[in-house]
């Protein structure tokens, strides 16, 4: 389930799965593991029903079958504990990479972001957490059967991993800056309109006007500057430059430009004297949200079902490193969806990112499942890279997260708020 403090259920769930699969042949293991996964993914992906009921049913069934297939291919008998660990890790890796470049939502790793196992992420990313949960789960199952060798090996592996995480490099601080994360507020579960875009922009200007102290950098959420045509030709462009000048602070706004042939989603660096210094275009765009995979096949089906007008125009993919240069150092940038992918954070750090920024926008989603999982994902990226992470969303959640994955501040849904913090610029690897 999404990380609402229920992380022990992940470990107990693996233990229960191991017992549920015992003494069954491959077809039986496939059916049982698929059923368990449906019970797991069905509730935690419920937000998707509001967008596309058929897509929800297909996604839950398909991703559950991933785990069913892994359980079927794993050996039975004495090799079951090791085989189940491998099946869970490989199935999780497959979900994170395929199809559509991966859809790493409702994952076992996210459910452990609030657990004592979180530091293990600095060893080899989210799959380290998945492997640890699987090892603990099969060890608990073995404890029930008094299979002491399996229990001993599992305990030794977890103890060794925890020791390695404790002594592993965590990056090095090289300075500090004062920041403000702006959340304009407003209703959840909304859809785009031109009037709504104006309201969103005005809400963020109003929230920014409440900043009551000197800060070095102000982070705005993803696409709260939503314009038709090139942004430099829009009246909001000089208004933003003037706003940065008045603040005497670097402003990082999120822009979505609806161009004639495609769209582009990007963040800018606007200096404290009102000059645009840098730009990062989103690279890892959202399937069916910012582009349509296999459009040639999807469009006729959408036409038949009457949802053709809901298909998005394809966004233009960026191809530059995931960083923004600012007067206060190099910022690593992961716009919205990108924060769910460890390789985007690695790209940012590899190119000199000293602080990670996650401007995002979850205002269109039903419930708070996606937003909650995004905070969990941000915690993973912070630990994996040894960097502070700043997450800003127009209607929540916005959050300030340190290099250990601790959430120091988090907004509420729909409120207008500015989160302040003094954050470390950090270098080095984990």
Outline where the language-model segments fall.
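Membrane-embedded alpha-helical bundles of multi-pass enzymes
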Residues: 1-167, 367, 378-381, 393-395, ...
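Soluble catalytic domains of enzymes that build or remodel membrane lipids, polysaccharides, and related
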Residues: 169-429
């Amino acid at each position: 389930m999404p990380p609402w403090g229920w992380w022990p259920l992940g470990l107990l769930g693996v233990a229960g799965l191991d017992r549920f699969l015992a003494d069954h042949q491959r077809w039986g293991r496939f059916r049982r593991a698929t059923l368990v996964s449906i019970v797991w993914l069905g509730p935690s992906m419920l937000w998707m029903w509001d967008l596309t009921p058929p897509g929800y049913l297909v996604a839950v069934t398909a991703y559950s079958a991933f785990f069913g297939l892994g359980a079927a291919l794993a050996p039975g008998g004495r090799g079951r504990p090791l085989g189940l660990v491998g099946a869970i890790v490989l199935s999780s890796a497959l979900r994170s990479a395929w199809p559509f470049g991966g859809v790493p939502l409702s994952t076992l790793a996210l459910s452990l972001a609030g657990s004592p196992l979180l530091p293990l992420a600095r060893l080899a990313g989210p799959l380290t957490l998945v492997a640890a949960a699987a090892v603990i789960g099969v060890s608990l199952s073995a404890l029930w059967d008094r299979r002491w060798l399996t229990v001993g090996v599992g305990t030794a592996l977890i103890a060794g991993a925890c020791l390695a995480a404790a002594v592993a490099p965590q990056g090095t601080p090289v300075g500090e800056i004062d920041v403000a994360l702006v959340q304009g507020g407003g209703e959840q579960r909304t859809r785009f309109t031109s009037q709504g875009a104006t309201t969103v922009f005005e809400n963020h200007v109003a929230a920014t006007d409440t900043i009551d102290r000197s800060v070095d950098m102000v982070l705005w959420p993803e696409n709260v500057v939503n314009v038709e045509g090139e942004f430099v030709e829009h009246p909001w462009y000089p208004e933003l430059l003037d706003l940065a000048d008045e603040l005497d602070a670097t402003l990082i706004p999120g822009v979505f430009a609806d161009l004639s042939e495609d769209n582009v989603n990007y963040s800018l660096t606007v200096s404290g004297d009102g000059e645009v210094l840098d730009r990062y275009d989103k690279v890892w765009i959202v399937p069916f949200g910012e582009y349509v995979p296999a459009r040639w096949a999807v469009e006729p089906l959408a036409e038949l079902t009457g949802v053709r007008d809901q298909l998005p125009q394809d966004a233009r993919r960026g191809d530059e490193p995931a960083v923004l240069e600012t007067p206060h150092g190099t910022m690593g940038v992961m716009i919205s969806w990108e924060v769910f992918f460890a390789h985007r954070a690695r790209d940012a750090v590899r190119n000199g990112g000293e602080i990670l920024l996650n401007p995002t926008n979850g205002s269109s989603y039903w419930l708070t499942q996606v937003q909650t999982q995004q905070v969990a994902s941000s915690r993973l990226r912070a630990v994996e890279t040894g960097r502070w992470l700043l997450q800003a969303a127009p209607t929540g959640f916005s959050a300030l997260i340190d290099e250990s994955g601790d959430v120091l501040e988090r907004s509420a849904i729909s409120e207008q708020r500015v989160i302040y913090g003094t954050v470390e610029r950090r270098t080095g690897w984990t």
